[in-house]
């Protein structure tokens, strides 16, 4: 089979002085950071959809890419060709993982029977390619938002037949993910929301999606899937309002349906931007609530109100992300999936390499800076000092439920309390972070 990326043999680490655009300058997979290989900290994955399915189209123009697997012909054979090229890319990029939606890898077909057949065929193809290459599946998912049947949602659809079709897709995609050794399974409710409240029963739709997620958990245990279930929050787009608005909203939903011990979150940077949060906020919130699972590493444009899905290029922003992840013990089954696409004008096939190389170097630099912050420990010490009072007798009485409003009022009066504000030292902390970033 003729190589598609014939000009590249393999992307390798060459160091910060390298001028080779097809080399890593900072991502050295075998470099030891805090006692672990850099590759094992970062757990990079390529997104099948943006990299191999998007054709360069947008709301105002047709596709600008000329990918050979996107031409007319037998859909299943083209899907196999796409898999050939995808795994060529994974191996030449030296990336350990990939992620997919069901219909990214296999044509949907014109009927449920065709869909099931195509998924079965492509699952076998992917299994063979994983075996030959050593590339693994970080997570799989089902696309329950593109087909017109999902115009009013999948699990939240007013038609139970659509709900059943979506259940079939998730059932099939979960089984394929397990077969392929996937380490997670993701659920993103692209159209689980509403366009107008005039035709929407919020209570009904919430009960529907709650039951759907319970069935997903039941199926996970039934088939013995050992991976992590993940919900990916997003506030809007394509719907006006989505029910998985942000991490805190998802956590409230999980608590309502008794799923907070079963499902974690896959946090995307651009979705945080759309929700009016920083990426740092969403990661820290997920860690604080005990539901942090994985990351879709990309960036949005703060001046644009839609999901631009650009590759991450800010070491400053991502250092704080990696700091939170390292403090939490690092990834377990999750990783850094590049849910990002090259720009519509980036029509050269090798732009795919430039985009991923830059993103991987960005995250490597962020990891190294975050590790310096962990080793230095001054930031952590200053935060601990700020809350030290809660380790004392009064603080522990409050937290352990041994105090009431009345007892605290008596305490304040008897001790003639007159507490004074203590500086938050924000500027000192910002300087401390910059010192680790820039020396």
Swiss-Prot record:
It comes from the Bacteria. One of its GO terms (biological process) is D-xylose metabolic process. Homotetramer. GO terms for cellular component: cytoplasm. Mg(2+) 2 binds at residues 268, 271, 307, 309. It comes from Pectobacterium atrosepticum (strain SCRI 1043 / ATCC BAA-672). It is found in: Cytoplasm. Signal peptide: none annotated. This is Xylose isomerase. The keyword Metal-binding applies. Mg(2+) 1 binds at residues 232, 268, 296, 339. Its cofactor is Mg(2+). Belongs to the xylose isomerase family. NCBIfam families: PRK05474.1, xylose_isom_A. One of its GO terms (molecular function) is xylose isomerase activity. Keywords: Carbohydrate metabolism, Cytoplasm, Isomerase, Magnesium, Metal-binding, Xylose metabolism. The active site is at residues 101, 104.
